[in-house]
Amino acid sequence: MPKRAKKNEEGVDGEADNGTAAAKKEKKGKEPEAPILYEDPPEKLTSKDGRAANMKITSWNVDGLRAWVKKNGLDWVRKEDPDILCLQETKCAEKALPADITGMPEYPHKYWAGSEDKEGYSGVAMLCKTEPLNVTYGIGKEEHDKEGRVITAEFPDFFLVTAYVPNASRGLVRLDYRKTWDVDFRAYLCGLDARKPLVLCGDLNVAHQEIDLKNPKGNRKNAGFTPEEREGFTQLLEAGFTDSFRELYPDQAYAYTFWTYMMNARSKNVGWRLDYFVLSSALLPGLCDSKIRNTAMGSDHCPITLFLAV
């Protein structure tokens, strides 16, 4: 996902245009355009087939768990009160987790995955009010699993997969690896889906369509919006999965989940939609709402929340 330019793996999308190049080219004296902001509409708590939502899942790339806790991220979580909380880019070994989160009584069942080789890198977490039937880590391939990017929890009616998808990196140096990941991850998800429908959530590190970022023309060769990454996501959807937000809001522009820290991108709403809830087709009848909580602060991403009838 896009980050500050000084970072290595996570710096890529932050180096993308993100509106800054265009801004520098503007003539002196030209009035800047007023930002167009996205307002999260009222929650829909009933599915198309008339069922009431009985599952609430929140996903948030926290860009460093310890810093996010210090920025009062948990206060927002307690107000949102999801049944399941999924976090990405925790950048924190299990032994260094803040007591504020490990001791949360609201979520007695907590699961963590981190990078085996690098401290302060990658990492995902899942916090549940109800104990899953089973929990697994990774996708069964060592080259991917050592980076701590996936947790899968099995519940009676569905699998929940939270993922922090690899960034193609500065100069697209990891694009080939990302393409391999996309193939292997898709195969993993299809294998799960053959057993039980699934919800995939997390930072998938791709803006799928031009509507999913502010400046598509300036970012075609940048990580997160390359043809290869976009095609990888298209192939995932063609394998029988659905982008829940676009299912409900197909033409909604300016709805982003990430903003680089540079150039006041967030206040200008110069962003990318990189965070998703992707559903198996079997779960679509129970889809109630897919929310972008863009007023929640504490990270360069905002949280997203899914309401589902299962």
Curated annotation (Swiss-Prot):
Q: Where in the cell is it found?
A: Nucleus; Nucleus, Nucleolus; Nucleus speckle; Endoplasmic reticulum
Gene3D superfamilies (alphabetical)? Endonuclease/exonuclease/phosphatase
Q: Site: Transition state stabilizer. Where? A: 205
Site residues by UniProt (Interaction with DNA substrate): 301
Site label Important for catalytic activity, positions? 275
Q: Does the keyword RNA-binding apply?
A: yes
Q: Which UniProt keywords apply?
A: Cytoplasm, DNA damage, DNA repair, DNA-binding, Endonuclease, Endoplasmic reticulum, Hydrolase, Magnesium, Metal-binding, Mitochondrion, Nuclease, Nucleus, RNA-binding
Name its co-factor(s): Mg(2+); Mn(2+)
| Record region (Disordered) | 1-51
Listed under catalytic activity are: Exonucleolytic cleavage in the 3'- to 5'-direction to yield nucleoside 5'-phosphates
Locations of Basic and acidic residues compositional bias? 41-51
One annotated Gene Ontology cellular component of this protein: nuclear speck
Can you name one GO molecular function term for this protein?
Answer: metal ion binding
Coiled-coil features, chain-numbered ranges: none
Residues where Mg(2+) 2 binds = 203, 205
| Cofactor binding remark | Probably binds two magnesium or manganese ions per subunit.
Q: Member of which family?
A: Belongs to the DNA repair enzymes AP/ExoA family.
Q: What is this protein called?
A: DNA repair nuclease APEX1
Organism encoding this protein:
Danio rerio (Zebrafish)
> Gene of origin?
apex1
